[in-house]
Curated annotation (Swiss-Prot):
Stated name of the protein: A-type ATP synthase subunit G
Lineage: Archaea, Methanobacteriati, Methanobacteriota, Stenosarchaea group, Methanomicrobia
Assembly: Has multiple subunits, A(3), B(3), C, D, E, F, G, I and K(x); there may be a few other subunits as well.
GO terms (BP aspect): proton transmembrane transport
Localization per record: Cell membrane
Further remarks about this protein from its record: This organism has both a Na(+)-translocating F1F0 ATP synthase and this H(+)-translocating A1A0 ATP synthase.
pH-dependence annotation: Optimum pH is 5.2 for ATP hydrolysis.
Membrane topology term: Peripheral membrane protein
The protein's role, per its UniProt record: Component of the A-type ATP synthase that produces ATP from ADP in the presence of a proton gradient across the membrane.
Keyword Repressor: no
GO cellular component: plasma membrane
Amino acid sequence: MAECDDRPNLVERAVMKLGEPKNQARLLQVAWRISLLMMVIGFIIIIKTISPNFM
């Protein structure tokens, strides 16, 4: 049978690492940049749909 040890597994370590403020700030920056990029792409799609000769 497998022994029970108190070392955290990979998932637990990842969750603890993501809980650190520095990593949360980095995740927020990445999420913000992705959302900004999606918004810009959306505007381009809307403009291209309304006026196909724009770009």
